[in-house]
Amino acid sequence: MQTLHVELGDRRYPIFIGSQLNPQNLLAPYIKGRQVMIVTNTTLEQLYLQHYQDALHALDKQVAVCVLPDGEKYKNIEHLNLIFDALLKAGFNRDCTVLALGGGVIGDMAGFAAASFQRGVYFVQIPTTLLSQVDSSVGGKTGINHPLGKNMIGAFKQPEVVMADMSQLKTLPPRELSAGLAEVIKYALLGDIEFLGWLETHMDGLIAGDETLLAEAVYRSCAHKARIVANDEKEQGERALLNLGHTFGHAIESYLGYGEWLHGEAVATGMVMAADLSHRLGWISSGDLERTKKIIQRANLPISCPPIPLDEFLSYMSHDKKVLNGQLRLVLLQQLGQAIITKTFDVEMMKAAILANQASHT
């Protein structure tokens, strides 16, 4: 097992990374009160719920469960209310812990519930997908979607602990594993050229589900994110770099309908669009652009999206949370392994980069 810490002063918390982790031992110091609400989905209820219920009962905890349907399209106000209903029906108080057992959707919703129930209760993250292990479970961003934009309603809520168990990735469908690799590739492109080389060497093993390689990828990804979050918790500056590919990607997700494409798939194509624009601006070479496309393709991820009318694509981009004073800001690549956030780019070049990476209209 490897351990990282997100350094946030008195809110410092650990990330445990390994296989066959023991929840009873690892969670014991971090669950403050007796009451624990496990929030999970219908898929994970069958796979892992009993394991964690048993561990919590062994710690003499009062356990209740809220099971939500599985999928991004359920990340909305109606299903968030089901968590509040469960907390209130169980009679839980402000010393309770909300434990997220699931991927990014469950983590985002359970975290938002923990941030808002009785103005804030304890929160624990047990991410069960690669994407949530390397990204959404770390850093405290929580929230739900709105028909006009992804993650538009939410709060910052840091967990007490994150427990990433590689053995749970065995049950992950290949498409979900690939979606998680999009966020892993993101960390390499935005800040670590050596990590990009490591991914190029080991991509076949990662796709095959090698737990040792996956643990290393999760550790290196979380180390990047933990450092950035410690420096910029509320995304006033450097943390926005973690949105490489996301402005384009969120537009793709919003247009196609949440859940039609997985988040990681949309981010993958979004990163290609960002790299394409960076190339058009003269910042990266054509070889760098091809290298970006190749590593994304090797992870079995898309490098183009279905045809989307340009005016609608741009409209969704205008709802992005990085828009400041009416100006769109993009995360682009100054070089491979070095990203910047900028509002200085040629809009016509941006439009060309979007259109060039859509599947043929014919």
UniProtKB/Swiss-Prot annotation:
EC number(s) reported in the record: 4.2.3.4
Main location: cytoplasm
Cytoplasm keyword on record: yes
Gene: aroB
Cofactor note: Binds 1 divalent metal cation per subunit. Can use either Co(2+) or Zn(2+).
Sequence positions that bind Zn(2+): 183, 246, 263
Annotated pathway: Metabolic intermediate biosynthesis; chorismate biosynthesis; chorismate from D-erythrose 4-phosphate and phosphoenolpyruvate: step 2/7
Name listed for the protein in its UniProt record: 3-dehydroquinate synthase
Catalytic activity: 7-phospho-2-dehydro-3-deoxy-D-arabino-heptonate = 3-dehydroquinate + phosphate
Cofactor: Co(2+); Zn(2+); NAD(+)
